[in-house]
């Protein structure tokens, strides 16, 4: 949850959620499909439950 959002290196268009440490809430971002980090969640609820 503390890592910055990282969309990844590929060019897919996959909606995911990450925890924004500045706003202190989960937000939507577009994941590229590969790479990235562990601050990436399938649903808003999963992000909120974890972070």
Curated annotation (Swiss-Prot):
Disulfide bond as UniProt keyword: yes
Keyword Chloroplast: no
Pfam families, alphabetized: Kunitz_BPTI
UniProt xrefs under Gene3D superfamilies: Pancreatic trypsin inhibitor Kunitz domain (4.10.410.10)
Compartments where found: Secreted; Nematocyst
Keywords assigned by UniProt, alphabetized: Disulfide bond, Ion channel impairing toxin, Nematocyst, Neurotoxin, Potassium channel impairing toxin, Protease inhibitor, Secreted, Serine protease inhibitor, Toxin, Voltage-gated potassium channel impairing toxin
GO molecular function terms attached to this record: potassium channel regulator activity; serine-type endopeptidase inhibitor activity; toxin activity
TM spans (from-to): none
Primary location recorded for the protein, binned into one broad class: secreted
Matching InterPro entries: Kunitz_BPTI, Kunitz_BPTI_sf, Prtase_inh_Kunz-CS, TFPI/VKTCI-like
Disulfide bonds: 1-51, 10-34, 26-47
Record GO cellular component, one term: nematocyst
Function: Potent toxin and weak serine protease inhibitor that displays activity on both trypsin and elastase. May act as a neurotoxin by blocking voltage-gated potassium channels (Kv1.1/KCNA1 and Kv1.2/KCNA2). Has a neuroprotective effect, since it suppress, at low concentration, the 6-hydroxydopamine-induced neurotoxicity on the locomotive behavior of zebrafish. In vivo, has strong reversible antilocomotor activity. In addition, it is lethal to zebrafish larvae at high doses.
Protein family: Belongs to the venom Kunitz-type family. Sea anemone type 2 potassium channel toxin subfamily.
Name the record gives this protein: Kunitz-like toxin PcKuz3
The organism of origin for this protein: Palythoa caribaeorum (White encrusting zoanthid coral)
Lineage, top ranks: Eukaryota, Metazoa, Cnidaria, Anthozoa, Hexacorallia
């Amino acid at each position: 949850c503390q890592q910055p959002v990282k969309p990844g290196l590929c060019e897919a268009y996959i909606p995911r959620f990450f925890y924004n440490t500045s706003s202190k809430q989960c937000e939507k971002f577009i994941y590229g499909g590969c790479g990235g980090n562990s601050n990436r969640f399938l649903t808003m609820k999963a992000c909120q439950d974890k972070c």
